[in-house]
UniProtKB/Swiss-Prot annotation:
It comes from the Bacteria. Residues 28-270 form the ABC transporter domain. It comes from Novosphingobium aromaticivorans (strain ATCC 700278 / DSM 12444 / CCUG 56034 / CIP 105152 / NBRC 16084 / F199). This is Phosphate import ATP-binding protein PstB. PANTHER family: ABC TRANSPORTER I FAMILY MEMBER 17 (PTHR43423:SF1). Belongs to the ABC transporter superfamily. Phosphate importer (TC 3.A.1.7) family. It is found in: Cell inner membrane. The gene is pstB. It is an enzyme of class 7 (translocase). ATP binds at residues 60-67. It is a peripheral membrane protein. The complex is composed of two ATP-binding proteins (PstB), two transmembrane proteins (PstC and PstA) and a solute-binding protein (PstS).
Length: 275
């Protein structure tokens, strides 16, 4: 990073629809959440509101806990034997860690797109159809065809694959595979989409397409994205949370975080003094 960047806070384009925070209804809420791996505390007493139809970015240095916290929002940490979560995480006011919670159904409501594209070793069609089938969303082939088409359209992939739906999803390019994974997530009609470094394995052209897609999708979903790229956070999000050492140091409008941070540690990070 050059000397000028170190001296000057990052500039971001403020979108016209970037309304004040209190105008955005909360979709998910975390209250005093801590995450442990055995005796190690990875997340320490984090509270945050995730607004509906906004993109919320989690930024911070490697190992700061942002991906761990993201995974707690749909209980992906349950797959780790020694992990445990304390505190409350609410989806529309319901504690997702309560006894009796249907975790499979939760993960349909709160979908996940991972860092590396992970299409199933199935056809493009079956990659999208799999979720609606196992969740009993549709009972007819015609309805399933419609879900597949609409999901691929929303992911900006339909025109590229409509004539080869029987081809393997793994034969697509990296950027296409990631859009296929996004289409797979939205095929079960989620309410929240979590994205863990979704562009880190993609080239700049594919990254730009995914960022355009994120902006299009936020009109329907609450989206939370973990990114190491502050430029990407500035481009795609309306809210940004800066994590450091397992805590949220600062959370607010993206334009404020990057141009007028309240906390000195936030300013130091976004101006490249550490991280």
């Amino acid at each position: 990073m050059n000397a000028e960047a170190i001296q000057t806070p990052m500039t971001v384009d403020v979108k016209a629809d970037d309304k004040p925070y209190f105008d955005a209804p909360s979709k998910m809420s975390a209250k005093n959440v801590s995450v442990f791996y055995g005796d190690k505390r990875a997340i320490d007493d984090v509270s945050i509101e995730i607004p509906q139809r906004y993109v919320t970015a989690f930024i911070g240095p490697s190992g700061c806990g942002k991906s761990t916290f993201l995974r707690s929002l749909n209980r992906m940490n349950d797959t780790i034997a020694n992990a445990r979560v304390e505190g409350e995480i609410l989806l529309d006011g319901e504690d997702i860690y309560k006894s009796g919670m249907d975790v499979v159904q939760l993960r349909a409501r709160v979908g996940m797109v991972f860092q590396k594209p992970n299409p199933f070793p199935k056809s493009i069609y079956e990659n999208i159809a799999y979720g609606p089938k196992i969740h009993g969303i549709t009972g007819s082939k015609a309805e399933l065809d419609e879900i597949v088409e609409q999901s691929l359209r929303r992911a900006g992939l339909w025109d590229e694959v409509k004539d080869r739906l029987g081809d393997s999803g793994t034969a697509l390019s990296g950027g296409q595979q990631q859009r296929l994974c996004i289409a797979r997530a939205i095929a079960v009609d989620p309410e929240v989409i979590l994205m863990d470094e979704p562009c880190s394995a993609l080239d700049p052209i594919a990254t730009a397409r995914i960022e355009e897609l994120i902006d299009e999708l936020r009109g329907r979903y609450a989206i939370v994205i973990v990114t190491h790229s502050m430029q990407q956070a500035a481009r795609v999000s309306q809210r940004t949370a800066f994590f450091h050492l397992g805590k949220i140091v600062e959370y607010g409008k993206t334009s404020d975080i990057f141009t007028n941070p309240r906390e000195e540690r936030t300013k130091d990070y976004i101006t490249g003094r550490y991280g």
